[in-house]
Amino acid sequence: MALTLSTTKTFTNINCSNNTSNITTFKPLKLPLFWPWQKVKMGPLSVSPMGFGTWAWGNQLLWGYQTSMDDQLQQAFELALENGINLFDTADSYGTGRLNGQSERLLGKFIKESQGLKGKQNEVVVATKFAAYPWRLTSGQFVNACRASLDRLQIDQLGIGQLHWSTASYAPLQELVLWDGLVQMYEKGLVRAVGVSNYGPQQLVKIHDYLKTRGVPLCSAQVQFSLLSMGKEQLEIKSICDELGIRLISYSPLGLGMLTGKYSSSKLPTGPRSLLFRQILPGLEPLLLALSEIAKKRGKTMPQVAINWCICKGTVPIPGIKSVRHVEDNLGALGWKLTNDEQLQLEYAAKESPKSMIQNIFQTR
């Protein structure tokens, strides 16, 4: 399912540096220079070193989605494909109210209609997440949720089927049922690989061991991971992933937009995000200053620097995209590496900043 591209193709919007300094702050990893056609392994899959998230597609409450945006979303998707991105993350719960599932529907439509994928739709790696709704009480119901996602996506097989969150803290018996559902999806060939989202260190090890006894490898673990989310628990999750051969997918690599440099205490986003920004932004001055300094020195933007840091840590970040401009900017995070000194500068600045991202309430221990 990996997207195969000719290395002679001209790629736009990607700046390149020959700097390949070693990384010493985390467990050393052998990494490519992050060109999108130099895929990284994610279980049995080969994916671009950065994917794109589609949380905003259909979300009116937080991201202000309107159906009039669909054309620009499709243009953004096409540009991502043209530049070698083949990993797209979604969820069966993405979309608000009557638009529930809209993200999957749009992604499926764009894949089917893509001019660059004529007869090759299966080369896109779709990773979707299944919500642990309280009415999904049997493994069969969880498998049916997977089939419903396949219908909305108009595809026969998922790249990665993911459990959206753990129910261990409030419904431990349901948790075992959902794990069995993941196994059945894999055994029935509905998914090429399975993953989890919002799993803390303890539950991550438990589900890995459970799946191993069932003969199913755990491909990926998706958590909030960024310069704003690099606390003790997140680093422990990353260490476990490295040890067990699980690829960490980092969502919200830009901290819901706080690391873009677009906002300040006097310039806040509209909607519910403004409440969070009002709490956190005033304490981010050291980190934002470091991002700005490195971006200016490198001829990059602050988002490109923040995303590149995630890639340097061996994760696959999935920034959200809502426009061609977002894709163009995010693609500039590829084709170069932060030096070790630059990474240390950012990490020190993050620690010096008195505020960090609030932990997702769905993440368990």
Curated annotation (Swiss-Prot):
Pfam families: Aldo_ket_red. It catalyses: pyridoxine + NADP(+) = pyridoxal + NADPH + H(+). Residues 1-15 form a transit peptide. The active site is at Y94. Its EC number is 1.1.1.65. GO terms for cellular component: chloroplast; plastid. The keyword rRNA-binding does not apply. GO terms for biological process: pyridoxal 5'-phosphate salvage; pyridoxal biosynthetic process; vitamin B6 catabolic process. Its main location: plastid. InterPro entries: AKR, Aldo-Keto_reductase, Aldo/ket_reductase_CS, NADP_OxRdtase_dom, NADP_OxRdtase_dom_sf. Coiled coil: none annotated. It is found in: Plastid, Chloroplast. Keywords: Chloroplast, NADP, Oxidoreductase, Plastid, Transit peptide. GO terms for molecular function: NADPH binding; pyridoxine:NADP 4-dehydrogenase activity. Optimum pH is 6-7.5 for the reverse reaction. It comes from the Eukaryota. Catalyzes the reduction of pyridoxal (PL) with NADPH and oxidation of pyridoxine (PN) with NADP(+). Involved in the PLP salvage pathway. Belongs to the aldo/keto reductase family. Mutants with reduced expression of PLR1 have lower levels of total B6 vitamers but there is no reduction in PN or PNP levels. Monomer. This is Pyridoxal reductase, chloroplastic. It comes from Arabidopsis thaliana (Mouse-ear cress).
